[in-house]
Each structure stands twice: as C-alpha cells, then as structure tokens.
C-alpha cells in the first residue's frame, strides 16, 4: 500500500487504500497485455503509463473520480484553483498519453473537453447490474390515503460531497414535512453530524416521524427503494451516481441536484426531477410537486425503471471492448 506523507491519517479515516508499485509485476503484466487500461490516476498509474509507453503499448483510461472528491476530504473541495491544478497534473502525466478515455457521463465528457484533454473522449456508463423491479405494477390500496406517511429516502455515503444537509434543510420548507418520514441510507465520516441535523428536525417538531438512519445491504436497498415514495440525490461532486440509478431501477422517482461537476442529473427524464444544487427551497418545491401528484409519480416511476435498461452493464462492456479494439488498431501515443 502506498502511503501519502502528511495526509495518510485522513485517507485512513475515509477508508481508502492506494496501491504501491511492484515494477517487476507491472512490467510482466504490461508485456502480456495488448492494451493497458487506467482505472484511477494515482502513483501506480503514473508508473504504468511510463512503462506502457516504454514498451509501446496503447493506453486507455476510465475517468472515475474528480479532484474534488479527494480535496473535499481535506476541506479543499471548493478551492477551484487547487482542484484544477490536480486535474491538469492528471491530464499531463496520465490522460494525455491515452488514446481513449471512457467518460461515464456527459458532465465528465464536457469537463475534460473544456480542459483540452487530447484523447478520444467517449461517453460510456460504468453500467448497472440488471435487477428485477419488485415494485408492483399497480399502487397498493393505501397509496392515495392522505394520512399515510410518505417515505422519502437518500441513499449514499455520508460525506461532504454527497450534501445530505441540503435535503435535511429542505424539509423545513416542505408543505408535506408532517407526513414525510426520511431515511438516510449509508454510512461515512459525517454520519454523526448528519444524524444530529436530522434528529433536530424531529425534536423541533418539523417532522412527525422519527428519521431512520441505517446502513443497508444491496437486497435491503432494493426493498427500501421499491417501497419509497421519492428518492433525493444532492451530491455536488459526482461522476455518475450508482446509488440513484439502482433506486430508479425500482421505479422510484428521483429529485437530483444539477451542478457544475455533478453528473447524475442526466438521468432525470425532465426538469421536475432536477433542482439547483445546494438550494433547499428549490429542492422542497420539487419534492412537494411530486408528493402532491401521487398518480403521476407512480406512472413516472415506471418510465424511470424502463430508462435504466439503457445502462445495462453488458451494453457498457460491449462499448468498452470496441474502445479497446480501436486503441489497439491506433497503437500507442
């Protein structure tokens, strides 16, 4: 494991591990390969790029992480100059030696294009594992009951960049607050702080129902999404957003933040499911519209489940294989 001076305790607290380099193993693998694919942009990848170039192997990459994902853990997520500097470092030392780069979303494609990345940029989703929608075709008998609690969920790691506080603040502006029961599904470094924020709404009487805060297995998340009324996604830094995509597989209507470097909003089928990032009032308005239109919400959920079929991981794999074939045909840079 590679250790970063000064920052290693913070990295450990986030639960991350960075690979170290065994040059003999790396050289053996690269000599064997027809194409060398970079999954990240760290120390191991710099060594791999240098060796692949030396051995004349074509290089490709997937853009999986924004600099802001790292910098936000250091309290520097909003330092645009620092994040741009890191991204340019990645570009100059890794990505510009690639023939092709997989961009999981349009948002990523546009960012790399605007920063003059030289590679062939290709929008290819990371893909979803196909999953059966277990939400029934017709709503249950009590679905239109004006007294029943409305389940609004947020699935995601409890960290600064996921921005659960905007969701929590939005509840103070919601006309349905007394009927809403929120569920924060996940864990992470900000779990205690976000739990306190959510519980304060309950103690202050804003919420009638006590918030549910828990970590769930994949099977449990499927059931949670299938039984929920709405799913909120506030992330300000997001390459793609697997959690919201998996929720939509269960015919759950989302309300998703749109921001400069958050790519998940592309999955919204229309503007009713998009709000301005870090704007709790706008989020509350979008939530309230959907909660006030249960029949439209149910039918729209079916369309969301159908839309996720386009992101089947098998389709993404086929597109990536074609990308590799093109890279081999073009040769190394």
Kindly label every feature range from the protein language model.
Residues 192-219:
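Nucleotide-activated donor-binding/catalytic signature segment of Leloir-type glycosyltransferases, i.e.
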Residues 54, 66, 82-100, 115:
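Membrane-proximal helix-turn-helix segments that form the acceptor-binding/catalytic region
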Residues 128-148:
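Acidic anion/phosphate-binding donor-loop and adjacent secondary structure
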Residues 107, 127:
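Carbohydrate-associated surface elements
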Residues 269-280, 289-294:
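Conserved acidic donor-binding segment of nucleotide-sugar-dependent glycosyltransferases
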Residues 150-173, 189-192, 281:
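A conserved mid-protein helix/loop that constitutes part of the nucleotide-sugar donor-binding site
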Residues 30, 216, 222-228:
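Short alpha-helical donor nucleotide-sugar binding micro-motif in glycosyltransferases
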Residues 41, 236:
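Aromatic "clamp/platform" in nucleotide-sugar-dependent glycosyltransferases that forms part
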